Amino acid sequence: MPTVNQLIRKPRQANVKRNKVPALQENPQKRGVCTRVYTTTPRKPNSALRKVAKIRLTNGFEVIGYIPGEGHNLQEHSVVMIRGGRVKDLPGVRYHIIRGVLDTQGVKNRKQRRSKYGAKRPK
């Protein structure tokens, strides 16, 4: 425990909170255009081909967004909406593409957790 004199000489430092999604600039979502759609492999110990897209946002940022769900219709020049949320086993992927918004279609034949994948209610 520091003395009063030590605290006068060097005050306590406040914790600086680092922004985990800087490209959103405090907005809940941002729009962007896909510049490249590709698959990448996750870190150890996982193994898969994860679908991701490089996106140029309206504010000029270039980010990598994860495409959730099974199957997608994205290609170069598709207009997408992104939200924050990293993918733990993909380094550098700090954003998710929102399904069912703008050019991104919802997941087909989705019965549960439909709102997360932009799927309409089955008849």
Swiss-Prot record:
Gene3D superfamilies: Nucleic acid-binding proteins. It holds the Pfam family Ribosom_S12_S23. Keywords: Methylation, Ribonucleoprotein, Ribosomal protein, RNA-binding, rRNA-binding, tRNA-binding. The keyword Ribonucleoprotein applies. Disulfide bonds: none annotated. PROSITE patterns: RIBOSOMAL_S12. With S4 and S5 plays an important role in translational accuracy. Part of the 30S ribosomal subunit. Contacts proteins S8 and S17. May interact with IF1 in the 30S initiation complex. Belongs to the universal ribosomal protein uS12 family. This is Small ribosomal subunit protein uS12. It comes from Rhizobium etli (strain ATCC 51251 / DSM 11541 / JCM 21823 / NBRC 15573 / CFN 42). The lineage of its organism: Bacteria, Pseudomonadati, Pseudomonadota, Alphaproteobacteria, Hyphomicrobiales. The gene is rpsL.
